[in-house]
Amino acid sequence: MGSGWHEWPLVIFTVFGQCVAGALIVMGFVWLKENDDKARMRIVRSLFFLWLVMGIGFMASVLHLGSPLRAFNSLNRVGASALSNEIAAGSIFFAVGGFWWLVSVIGKMPPALGKIWLVVSQILGIVFVWAMIRVYQIETVPTWYTGYTTLSFFLTMVLAGPLLAALLLRVANVTFKSTLAASVSALALIVCVAVVVLQSNTLGTIQSSIQQANALLPDYGSLQVWRIALLAAGLGCWICPLIRRQEPKTLGLFAGVALVALGELIGRGLFYGLHMTAGLAIAG
């Protein structure tokens, strides 16, 4: 019962990780297309904040596990355990992407190798998100064992990632024609609304011998409304200036990132609050 916030370390880890993966894809493409070496270096420097966010996410995951030693022990079953695969995928993404950033920021990365390394890092980010999804594809948890889980995790990456990238590129004073990225995020919001509606209907059909799924979160509907409102307001801070053919302001983009992040944190809390088993036991 509740809002699922009792799993706040996992809420932060998954949302932050997906945001970083999405932002790296956008910022990486801008870096690859940029011909000005000075602008490229400003992009690289601004990427520091991505890895800072990723570091916060990993610290939250360690709090969930209890100690760093448990995180290392969980790697013992890579290939056989979805949790081990998630930690391994996240660690590799963090290490490969972080090392690319470190070598690039000190100016020691060869140009050709740097491009390949960055693309590999972007792909590893997608693999990391997919590994997260596999952790929650549990047959005995019918509220999670659906395509909505896959959609929701990737939607977070598409909703929050490009907006975070737009903010960091603005801070770096790099020209970013963000109409396409903003359109993709707006489309993701529409899909997100559809997922909420369809999943709400599905919850009414899921039950165990002692519990119905739609009774797990009595405030599910109202919290989802707040979540969608926050997402719409956050994206509006980015999209409205573009509609007026103006460059979004740094403060507006920062507010947008904060609103979208809050909305996705609420949504992920609801996800964990929907945990129920197919047997007699109910968790959450």
Which residues fall in each region the model found?
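Alpha-helical membrane-inserting segments
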Residues: 29, 56-59, 164, 168
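Interfacial loop-to-helix junctions that mark the boundaries of transmembrane helices
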Residues: 41-42, 79-84, 114
